Amino acid sequence: MPGQSSPWVEIGSGLDGLGLWQEVTFTVHYQVPEGQQAPNDVNVTVEVAADGEGKNIIQSDRYQLRGRSFIWEIPGNFNRGKAHTLEEIHRDLLARLKSHPTTGKMPRLIPVYGILGGSWHGKRNSNKEFLHLRTETGLLLGRNVWKKDELYPDLEQKYRIPDGKLLAIDVRGVRTAKLEVFLLGLKDKERIRVVSFGDEIGVGGYNLNSSPDNKMFHEYLKAAGLSPSDLGFGEWNQARLVDESEAFKMPKAYYWSRLFGIDKDIEKLAKRTRIVEKILGPGVYTGANFSPHSQFWPRFGQWVRLFRKRGMTMPWSEDYIWQIPELSPQVTGYLLDVLRSAGRIEKMPIHYYTMPHWPGNTPKDLTLSFYSALAHGNKVINYFAAVPIYSYTENYVSWEATETWKAIRDLTHDVGLAEDIIWKGQVRPSQVAILLSHATDIWEAAKGSSIYNFERKNVYYTLRHAQVPLDFITEGDLIDGSASTTRVIYFVGTHLRRAAAEKLRDWVANGGLLFSVAGGGFLDEYNQPMDVLAPVYGVKSQSLTVTEKNLWAKQLFQWLRPLAHFSYPGASSKLPAYIARQDIEPETAIVMGRFDDGKAAVIRNRFGNGLATLVATFPGSAYIHPAIPKRPWDRSTSDDGFAHFLPTDFDQSAKQIIAEPITEAGLANILPVESSNPLVDATVIESPTGIVVALANYSNGFIPDLTVRIRDVGRVRSVIAVRAERLQIARDGEHMSVTLPLEWGDMIVIRR
């Protein structure tokens, strides 16, 4: 009733323990006098007191409510400021963004997802002012994907929204049997570009005791030309699925069980993809976000095989890097280069969540991840989720994170200055590749291990810090000959398909350069000894010891003691051997480095017209180890915290060993892009109309004069950087050098 008030309600225990903003919903309950209608508007006074009796009032505001409820955003500590309504705080955020000029423009070709705007289905009656403010905030940040009924006419005219094929829909809740009818009934079908099949999905499951699964397994084996005896069974009624508990007793059955589970799920997704393509036509891509947690391991079956078999057509992942003790946001490049390999044949566009979460991430690491994603092939921007806390309690950017909100706006508008080249362009192919082995992945998983993925990442970082461009190739690429033009192959694994090992042997004989770490492919896909590569390495015998299963660059690894030390010509000191040691008895190989006990640590062998190097430990891990301080892992939101620490003090002797094949192949002087600071992640993205060189600075500091040399630029009409205003440009025939200041990220845009 008018004039009445509620009792005091204690809220202090619910305030955020970190002192951050959060929302509180106030619902006004009132009794309408008999015979009267409820009013459209209700005037209420909301008071906050420092005591339970209301004697020490610290805030009092009067509001006219449209409906019965409203939301306050309240600080974790009222000494830091007063509470605000959503309208007030949106007005404040808009003012902060408008006071921050941006030189870029909203993208029109590349979709931008994951930014707030439009309708909101929260626990309140959303009034027009709130929705208008929310929508303009999203527009100012660069959101360019809107349904036709989401935009206010004044905002649509002011921001000139593209009306192209940019919409995304999610059909995870639509069964395959009903998917076609569902798609036919959609409005705006012609505007859809992305169809999501789910979030953080997995493939490869099967039920050991399921009669239908085992029956499908039999049909799968028959289609592959296999009989029960090939897998160690007597008759078909004895053939069955096998999991990790029997993997090492029944290795052939286990290997084919894993392939069956993966391919079974791929075909389910492929069926949905075919329906989408039938109804929505060309230019529409299917995908589902893949989580790389917790080892940032792009497992071959899901991350590569699925797309090579067209289960889906848009490789898609997320960073969440600040949650995992990875080396740095440069792991983004590793993930995307694997996804780029997955979609290589059809040039599938990559979709990547670059996450601005605050608290959690920082503007620096957001910028690094964003620019590394662009450099390695990302074509769909998704911030999941650049929204305030009232939208999610897990994925959000807090109101007070002004620098993060600015970074989101800047990054989005940076892309608008180069999107025509990025969308139609491709990362320039490399003559150097890392070989992915599905066989190694399957047997690593059987042991509960991810250690070869750990070393593979470390070899990747080493080569990228040597400014070597990298592609990833597969066992299938070796078998079908599509990897034949690769000059240098790096292999980090234990197992290889026998057919792939034979092709790798022939590739070396024909002039290829092979570099392998401890393991080297002496086991086949059935976990059986294999000597196909022994003459390639020039090895008479070998045995392998691996001491760890799971490590992270910033957790556990920095306290690890070396198993031994070894010498190498030109190294300033002896190098440590971490995690793995392979005892090698050379036959024709030359011993280049020895362990303290005199045994071979690095061998090199001429085989036919090619050359093979085998390092009997993990040299990539030796490269990163001195750069990681012995600090406890944290999840802080400060660039000073260990979660956001950028390592720089790497072992240059280890890099020398790993990068030596690049020099021997004559590639060191013809790298497509080189920068004066090797810790800048840079690639060449090329289209018929120009080149984009995306730069991500992992040197842990501002670079006042970075010189970037780009090969084979061709005819040049204009050169700009999307951020740096001061450029020095020099031509050297077909090549170009650009000198510019670099903080964390930038793009050089060369138009032809």
Predicted regions and their residues:
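Mature N-terminal, pre-catalytic/accessory segment of carbohydrate-active enzymes
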Residues: 1-162, 166, 175-197, 230-235, ...
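The substrate-binding groove and active-site-proximal loops of carbohydrate-active enzymes
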Residues: 110, 114-119, 163-175, 247-266, ...
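Alpha-helical scaffolding within the catalytic cores
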Residues: 125-126, 150-155, 177-182, 294-306, ...
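Aromatic-Pro/Gly-enriched surface loop or interdomain linker
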Residues: 93, 98-106, 401-485, 518, ...
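A conserved amphipathic helix/loop scaffold
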Residues: 492-752
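Polysaccharide-binding and catalytic clefts of secreted carbohydrate-active enzymes
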Residues: 84-92, 96, 100, 178-342
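Catalytic-core region of carbohydrate-active enzymes that cleave or remodel glycosidic bonds
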Residues: 272-285, 302-388, 495, 594-598, ...
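Aromatic/acidic polysaccharide-binding cleft in carbohydrate-active enzymes
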Residues: 315-322, 351-406, 429-449, 520-521, ...
